Amino acid sequence: MTSSLYRRIYSGDSLYSAWRKVKESAFSSSSETIRNEAKDFESQLPKSLSDIQRALSKKTFTFQKQTGVAKTKANGNSRPIVLSPIPNRIVQRALLDALSRIKFVKEALDTPTSYGGIRNKRVSMAVADAKEAISKGAAFHIRSDIAEFFTRIDKARVVELVAPHIKCPDTLALFQAAITTDLANIDVLRRQGLDEIFPLGVEGVAQGSPLSPLIANLYLHDFDKTMNDGDVICLRYIDDFLILGKDMGRVDRAFNKAQRELKKLSLHAYQPSATSDKASRGLTANGFDFLGCFLSAGLIQPSTITRERFKKRVKSDLDASIRMMKFSIEAGDIFPKGSYSGALQNLDRVILGWGKAFSFCSNGHWIKSLDDYITSALAQYEMEKTNLFQKTNGTAQRTMLGVRLLAAVHSERTEME
């Protein structure tokens, strides 16, 4: 007999709520492919959700193959991101909502010093709690993150953690399937030598899955409890953590304890050093980076690394648009994201998303500095676009602008008929 927990997963209310959250995330994505996939799914409602509900109720739902994307990090290494089809994400989200009602899971998510991937908790809260601890006398810190965290998670251990509390074979089987990675483009990644960074075996969970933050918080629940039972405070946001204490000795001992706890999970944290951007150690009065912010006395602002990364993203997107406009002229076709109008819309979304993410930071010169940079980058972009314009005719100019030709629309319709 189907359990109430499993029935909750495929209830109409649960699936529709999951779709709303997936839709919000997809529509705000800078990826046109993801936005279009969500639009296609929405255009087929309510059938698209009914199909998922029917498959789940009959226990025939299967997760579609995902796409692996090797995202280049600032240090030149690749971060494995797994992009799942909309139906996968809806079921993962519905599963997340159902599991979040289980007592064991609720206790883990209620941990006061854990912030990432938890409803109604945000980066700003972790930063605010760090500032409060400093104001109460925490004069020293160690900040670090757990090396290769998501790719080192033992999936079998995750299942062992939740199985005694789920007590439903159907839900457990769905959970196991939901955290399994099966890539459609694995051959391409293998030829590029990138297949080994993806969580295809017993180790690792997909970054990008709605379930990944939950798994992280369950996996590190004992770590959170152990690290906050002494005379320091340890704030954690997924795989980043900050230890604050009244003297350096206490903080150092706490960090050594953190390494011992992580070793039990076959994990380790980066050692603080003057040359590393992964970890830091010292006086809180001197300021330090945490969760993309720089914290110092009376001031919270995006860190230098965060701001440089944002500027690089702005320039990279505008440069890519110029290249794609040139290609559009040669191909005689529109590439929306690379067109003039598409590039400006994309940049506006990037600015809005980044600005909201750091809206809790203190006002300061950094805001004007970034706005000045964007204005300068746009002026350069406008100049390059104008140079291209002067070398083309009206039809090519329309293509560059991202405004399709009526004749092309008519031609497409004729071909379909």
Annotate the PLM regions.
Residues 1-50, 55, 385, 395-398, ...:
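Non-catalytic, polymerase-adjacent accessory regions of viral genome-replication enzymes
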Residues 5-8, 96-154:
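Active-site-proximal segment of RNA-dependent polymerases
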Residues 34, 76-80, 111-113, 144, ...:
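Glycine- and acidic
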Residues 55-76, 97, 175-195:
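Reverse-transcriptase-like RNA-dependent polymerase core
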Residues 78-110, 200-229:
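Conserved pre-motif C helix in the palm subdomain of viral-like polymerases
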Residues 93, 196, 225, 252, ...:
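Right-hand nucleic-acid polymerase module
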Residues 132-238, 242-261, 282, 287, ...:
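Conserved polymerase palm-domain catalytic core
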